[in-house]
């Protein structure tokens, strides 16, 4: 017969744990992982320390080099609601001849000591009617099969809102491609047609671009399409003599 003062092993025992000697298992594991993460982070930072001597532009379009603009065309396009329209058809022979003949003019200063580092397709969109309140949409694909014929009009599917200044900009340089492109004068002097296919389209994409609006009505858009070539400029040669003429 057990009394309130006698020992009963079935009642169990009560322990008071001192937090000085016992810790939560979850906090122990989290602290260990946190220390391991900090050690790995320090090792990664040490490997990246030599790169702090270099400066890069967040936006390659605004980086070092000269932006040489080649305007392809300015046109007014009528866009229906809930649809997007194809911007440019690269396969048109007249379009190619007119565009690249302008590219080879003297007004486009590319010489042997300059390199094309990148090419941007820039589309500037403006409404033609006053007091219109809508935003421009755009959608593009960089690559497709050579035999693919894009549709003139498509329905809006996952578009992107065009940002500041109603300007849509796409970098056409292929990842791991042949940039920089050099010695352009000698290339296109030999064969004009081969230069377009072998030099330009070999290193840069021919994108498919559609534009539209989020308006519920039919809208007129003034499109200005241009190629902007990012040209690397080299420092001029140092003079051989230091005299009054220099």
Curated annotation (Swiss-Prot):
Organism from which the protein derives: Spodoptera exigua nuclear polyhedrosis virus (strain US)
KW Ribosomal protein (keyword) present: no
Please report which protein family the annotation says this sequence is part of: Belongs to the polyhedrin family.
Q: Does the keyword Phosphoprotein apply?
A: no
* Source organism phylogeny: Viruses, Viruses incertae sedis, Naldaviricetes, Lefavirales, Baculoviridae
Q: Which InterPro entries match?
A: Polyhedrin
Task: Give this protein's Gene Ontology molecular function annotations.
Answer: structural molecule activity
Instruction: State the function annotated in the UniProt record.
Output: Major component of the virus occlusion bodies, which are large proteinaceous structures (polyhedra), that protect the virus from the outside environment for extended periods until they are ingested by insect larvae.
- Know the name of this protein? Polyhedrin
Which gene does this sequence derive from?
PH
